[in-house]
Amino acid sequence: HAMNPILSFLLWLGAHTVPANHLTDEGLRIKPSDNLPMLRALGRDPLIIKSSRTDTIYGLTELMGAALNSAPNLDRPTLVLGAANDELVPSEAHQSLLRLLETEHNAVTYPNGWHMLLRDLQAKIVWRDILSWIRNRHAPLPSGDGREPKNSK
């Protein structure tokens, strides 16, 4: 796991003692995006989940850990997108993923990106990079943020 061990333990404890307890982001002061109008709209949307059960959050973090541990088994070219301002996915977790990947991969960390890369104010830059990579994964990305492919075989 790339998660803080104390937080991991507290989440495990909560999931196993008060699994139906609902948690919100209230008081966390986490900024998931620089697109404030979009965040406000999500906050008003009645279909957006505004609290999650403790066991659900624990399950999500376990799934993320399993995905990270499975990274060496990924056998397809991969575009890995990261955000320099991501306050939800720790930089260490992103770097661990890149170290574990054994397949050919392109890694991009957007200096002005946030957790919600595809909804951030610079989303169009990310969209163009994704479309370009889908069309030709060996071509430079339009943003210029891409690095040379890693582990090319």
Question: Which sequence ranges carry the predicted segments?
Answer:
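Catalytic active-site module of serine/aspartate enzymes centered on a nucleophile-bearing elbow/loop
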Residues: 104-153
